[in-house]
Amino acid sequence: MIYEFASAENIGDRKEQQDRVVVMSHPTAADVVLAVLTDGMGGHTGGALAAQSVIDAVVPMFEAFTPAAGAADDWLRAMIMAANDKVAAAGKGYNRDPRATCVLALAQPGRINWAHCGDSRLYLFRDGEFASRTEDHSLVEILLQQGKITEAEVDTHPERSKLFTSLGGAEPPQIATGCIEKCRPQDTVLLASDGLWAYFQAREMADLIGYRNLTAGCDRLIGLARKRASGNGDNLSIAMIRASAPIKRGLIGTLFRSRLVEPSPLEDARRFMLNYLRAISGPVADDLTLRIEACKSGAELSAQFPGAAEAVEGQGGAAQATFFVQRVKELLEEA
């Protein structure tokens, strides 16, 4: 198994870029890849200093990592603890109070281990669908786990940015770890800062990256997040790693060409609408699904839009319908 990877970042509408992201293969093992994404916390002084300190601590440790030695979880924990110490030391040296969040993914043949602290997230997409994500170290995540708010309310909750752990503080950081075992071809992990994930539901992310090469997927998500921020967006950063079957001799040209073929905006809109309707099911949704599958133009798809929006509102409520309408309008405008 081999891994493709890509990353991107954007300053958003802030004066300073306080996110950092690095994705790299191991210097002695091309099939071992590390992604590290860190977000310097804007509520403290020295956010950019904190984020850069994380990178400065983690990258040399990865370069010294021996893939065959030790448990990956232990290595990732050690990397985050080293980053924590470096952030704290940087604060003392510059008389500041830097803090940062961090998420790491370590891909080795057949598995991907991850670790995180704070609200920078890792998502897993499998078979073109959202499978799981890390749980934020935040008050809002606790409310979600207690059933007091919904997943859709997390992104816009007024307390969303309140974390109970981070790197660089007086207390040792809380670190969560996990492993995606028996990776399948096309399994994709996506790392994102809150400046990016706040603008998307996980199901929409799956639609946007499922049939794209990784660089195009990163660019598309950042572009849409910037559009939705309407001039008041945070720093954004994203990294992706995708598992691929080894390329056989003679198939390289075909595979390379196929990865360059991007779906049209019309196909994006069709797939987005179909995914929503299949999720709610029922006679009305099933009939709309057949109609949308038969659409061959933007005009035909637009004609089915009002009925689809009504069906989504009937099953998912006003909040889901509002999101559905906004996203479909964006896609149809592009088509």
Which ranges hold each PLM region?
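Long, compositionally biased terminal regions
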Residues: 245-335
